[in-house]
Amino acid sequence: MIYIGLPQWSHPKWVRLGITSLEEYARHFNCVEGNTTLYALPKPEVVLRWREQTTDDFRFCFKFPATISHQAALRHCDDLVTEFLTRMSPLAPRIGKYWLQLPATFGPRELPALWHFLDSLPGEFTYGVEVRHPQFFAKGEEEQTLNRGLHQRGVNRVILDSRPVHAARPHSEAIRDAQRKKPKVPVHAVLTAKNPLIRFIGSDDMTQNRELFQVWLQKLAQWHQTTTPYLFLHTPDIAQAPELVHTLWEDLRKTLPEIGAVPAIPQQSSLF
């Protein structure tokens, strides 16, 4: 099994594609990044609505709130974690992964706090950790310690591939904004648990995106034999994300025939 989705389930320009709601999005994709929870907890009635708009084969990958990962730096936040997991509990059967997106200031010295935090989480869910501190990408003892600790706990290291967006010409505000915000870190395709998560940050150059994605075809084919990967496809202007799906899908299907036909959404050319 492989899960493929986008960083969000709605965008104003997707309305013209027929994607007007989470329910409609879920007809085309089997998972989604849950970025909204990084910034604020959804109201209980909103969580219930999300449950109503999806089925049990759909997967949400929600981020832990920034109040936990950034402000508290994983310390003395048991109440915040309980509040978050309780709020999201109606979606429990559809949680693909809860993941920590840690700031670049969270370095090797903070690893004891990470281990304590992960060890305190309920065992019923799958977890991921996305790091941004340079030493975790230096292939030294610090990175080895991180990977070893995640592996021992069965926690996935989230993989960010931002090569395409940082290789793009900065000819639009969307590109420039993405280049400012998306970390420019080495791509370390490390498998630490059974649900690897890849965030592929494309550019607006679909030919270049396809070229840079080729390395993932072999990796996904390999990982797919023993794990359940998640793949999220980004573009600087999220309106173009469905176009990236169309660009990469045929290559993905040749590698992973089980994904079936490309999602039946129109091409993006009419939007730009």
What are these regions (language model features)?
Residues 1-272:
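Residues lining hydrophobic/aromatic ligand-binding pockets adjacent to catalytic sites
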